[in-house]
Amino acid sequence: FILIVFLPNGTYLLWKLENTYSKPKIFPDKIDGMLILGSGTDPLLTDQHGQVTLTESIERITESIELIKKFPDAKVVYSGGMPTAKSQEKLSGVDVAKMFFTRMKIDVNKIIFEDQSKDTYENFIFSKKFINNTDGEKWLLVTSASHMKRAMSVAEKLGLNFIPYPVD
């Protein structure tokens, strides 16, 4: 019992979770699409300060910029979310992501923004209509490394196949 209290178990467990999947070292010849699970933005502070405010999960967006440039013909779906009814947010995560992509000179007209989801399961449910990867299409799933195991599990249960691309 004493060892459990004094050892850095949380750090080890997070490390183990984050290392379940690794970034692909070699990509297929063609990437047909990528699904970016939203996070990394702070809509409330963005609205209050009038500037894009980012959070600790920003790598989901920043890394996706490199992927969009690397695979310019790939379909891109950003699954963000909407403010909850109790929230004071006037902007959604999708609104802030659009602002950020625009500032980074990414054409937001080439990105499909899904803005109805409120959790991981809904990310896939609402994005599924944009994704056709059951016929051998190669799609990347971009999300935080600590979130990837859960996201891949949900995707698999819904019959969606992805190449994991964990970030952060």
Briefly describe each language-model feature range.
Residues 3-168:
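A structural signal for short, hydrophobic/glycine-enriched beta-strand patches
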